[in-house]
Amino acid sequence: MLIAQRPSLTEEVVDEFRSRFVIEPLEPGFGYTLGNSLRRTLLSSIPGAAVTSIRIDGVLHEFTTVPGVKEDVTDLILNIKQLVVSSEHDEPVVMYLRKQGPGLVTAADIAPPAGVEVHNPDLVLATLNGKGKLEMELTVERGRGYVSAVQNKQVGQEIGRIPVDSIYSPVLKVTYKVEATRVEQRTDFDKLIVDVETKQAMRPRDAMASAGKTLVELFGLARELNIDAEGIDMGPSPTDAALAADLALPIEELELTVRSYNCLKREGIHSVGELVARSEADLLDIRNFGAKSIDEVKAKLAGMGLALKDSPPGFDPTAAADAFGADDDADAGFVETEQY
């Protein structure tokens, strides 16, 4: 069985709707294999929502104008295509817009039903004069990729229903690059950097997760041909290996004071792993182990990125130490000895 080092994935947030994802180390050649697959999936296969058709009061087709509206219907449709919406419904839903002039008509004037949200309310849709009036229905559906107005046109649809181009994808832009990275003495491993920019309807990390899920489902089809076939197994991640090493350390490595060290040894706590399995309350049950010893242990563990087992809500180690009669400064029956 061949075992490769498990890559790690980290996210560098550029802004709310743009992130860079770094995957490393990858076996030589896998950077481009994975990067190209992720990019194509992100651009074409992430589910989203979009307006698929509209109906404007008093309008029969798109090649006309609306009285009192500066923009013609074609320009109005171009503006509507820039709407960023999300929908929780699997079936088509209708949003309504009613506005009396004069003034601008924006996406904020749209009244969406429950489960539908307009994410760019400042988008200007039309301009009305003093006599202008705009009443419109907008049908929203879920889908993926791009669907043209011709494809959205339904057989036998009502007169006045105007299909529009639908851009379902919540992803605006995806780029990737592959760099060399080093693992021990080898310098030919791949480092994949994927830059993802999305619309306001979805965060980049959610789009990345959706792409990963889709690819796993598709590649699973090949795996099902023979689930016992040999492949390259991923070993433990570097983080997991480092954590295991830290937990295996003897408590001598923490360089605690003699008092704290001896108390822990008498309790049978010999490793960091055994220590983090105890809560503050557990440690205060140990004779002569008080609040100052608790603070010392917590500080040492924090330096390693570790912590004690969760204590009960509202737990105060100082008050508990007083209740137990533990005092780190003096104890008549306690004799300090050197570490052994």
From Swiss-Prot:
Q: Which leading EC class covers this enzyme?
A: transferase
Q: Where in the cell is it found?
A: Cytoplasm, Nucleoid
Q: Which UniProt keywords apply?
A: Cytoplasm, DNA-directed RNA polymerase, Nucleotidyltransferase, Transcription, Transferase
GO BP, sorted A to Z: DNA-templated transcription
MF (Gene Ontology): DNA binding; DNA-directed RNA polymerase activity; protein dimerization activity
Q: Which reaction does it catalyse?
A: RNA(n) + a ribonucleoside 5'-triphosphate = RNA(n+1) + diphosphate
Q: Name one Pfam family in it.
A: RNA_pol_A_bac
Does the keyword Transferase feature in the UniProt annotation? yes
| Gene Ontology CC terms, in alphabetical order | cytoplasm; DNA-directed RNA polymerase complex; nucleoid
* Sequence segments annotated as region (Alpha N-terminal domain (alpha-NTD)): 1-226
Q: Which domain of life is it from?
A: Bacteria
Q: What does this protein do?
A: DNA-dependent RNA polymerase catalyzes the transcription of DNA into RNA using the four ribonucleoside triphosphates as substrates.
Tell me which family the UniProt entry assigns to this protein: Belongs to the RNA polymerase alpha chain family.
What UniProt notes about the protein's domains is: The N-terminal domain is essential for RNAP assembly and basal transcription, whereas the C-terminal domain is involved in interaction with transcriptional regulators and with upstream promoter elements.
Under which name does UniProt file this protein?
Answer: DNA-directed RNA polymerase subunit alpha
Q: What is the lineage of its organism?
A: Bacteria, Bacillati, Actinomycetota, Actinomycetes, Kitasatosporales
